A protein has these predicted regions:
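Active/ligand-binding-proximal structured segments within catalytic/core domains
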Residues: 31-65, 75-76
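Short secondary-structure junctions
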Residues: 66-70
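Low-complexity, highly charged intrinsically disordered N-terminal segments
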Residues: 146-158
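Active-site-adjacent, His/Asp/Glu-enriched structural segments that form or flank metal-binding
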Residues: 76-149
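Non-catalytic terminal extensions that flank enzyme cores
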Residues: 1-42, 156-159
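Generic structural motif
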Residues: 18-20, 73-78
């Protein structure tokens, strides 16, 4: 079997950032999958399940309610390796096109107060596995260390 594209990225040199993982054509529309990489794979700890689950709920809610981007959001969810998220948008986009959106989303997560959307037994299959206080710390760290003043090396996959 051939390696899928995401397994050809050198995870030993990959930095936290926002990367175009792939582009696919569906009918006449291009959809872009973004790799929102929050930790340096195999060099930093992965995100705990409670925090990544909370971020999934907050991020999906934020994106699907965004005044400018809601109609382009197809999917937002965690990577199985727990080092970040995939975000799929309608359109032929580049990483630089979504820096503002991703920064807004992580600011929303870092500053969120109140009940986590969908954190109820009726709404979620694992609603008890949430941790808002630590989620806010993880989101703020990504904002401060990666998204603020983001550079090209955090927007384009390494060779």
């Amino acid at each position: 079997m051939n390696k899928i594209a995401s397994f050809t990225v050198n995870h030993l040199t990959l930095l936290p950032g926002i990367y175009v993982s792939r582009k696919d054509k569906v009918g006449e529309e291009v959809i872009t999958t973004f790799d929102i990489r929050m930790t340096a794979p195999n060099r930093e700890p992965v995100i705990n399940t409670a925090e990544i689950h909370t971020m999934e709920h907050l991020g999906a809610t934020f994106l699907r309610n965004h005044k400018d981007w809601a109609e382009k959001i197809i999917y937002f969810g965690p990577m199985g390796c727990r080092t970040g998220f995939y975000m799929i948008l309608a359109g032929d986009l580049e990483s630089k096109d979504v820096v503002g959106l991703v920064t807004e989303m992580f600011t929303f997560m870092a500053e969120f107060e109140g009940d986590v959307p969908g954190a109820a037994a009726r709404d979620c299959g694992n609603y008890l596995d949430m941790n808002l206080p630590l989620t806010k710390i993880v989101a703020k760290r990504f904002l401060d260390n990666t998204l603020t003043n983001i550079t090209e090396e955090h927007l384009v996959y390494p060779d």
